[in-house]
């Protein structure tokens, strides 16, 4: 693999970093590989056209194969304690429009979510009209609830807006009531809470 060769210092001196002109080009590239299952987990509203591609953009993917997507996009690690070296960070840069754009390459079995839930997320994914994959509506809602109350210390106004769009009442958009709703859904489907790698928050109360 190209990135492994680069790490080991074995790549050709003439090797050129893969670059993409747009986020749409990235999605098109990913869709060329039938062995890769991938979704954008959240914050995909407005993609790929109505977002600013710069160093502040952070795209959260879930994939079935970390090393495959890293190779396809020629991603290079944005941190030192990287998964590639047996540690835990999966944050990578991908070059888009000559800018380094951050991607989280979350993968099945990494404890970001329960593995059974991760597999369901990929196996029930939906192709968005703009050419990228997203969770089905039910899974999007509940994984966003999980992210908002378990991974994060407080609920983002962005997520409050999305919860309302899904029909949730103001009165239950709080950690206690959302946790109760999530517990019921987890119990119904046989999912469990998972402690993720240390860079991710874990606020299970």
Feature map (PLM): residue ranges:
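Conserved NTP-donor binding/palm subdomain of two-metal-ion nucleotidyltransferases/polymerases, i.e.
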Residues: 3-57, 61-205
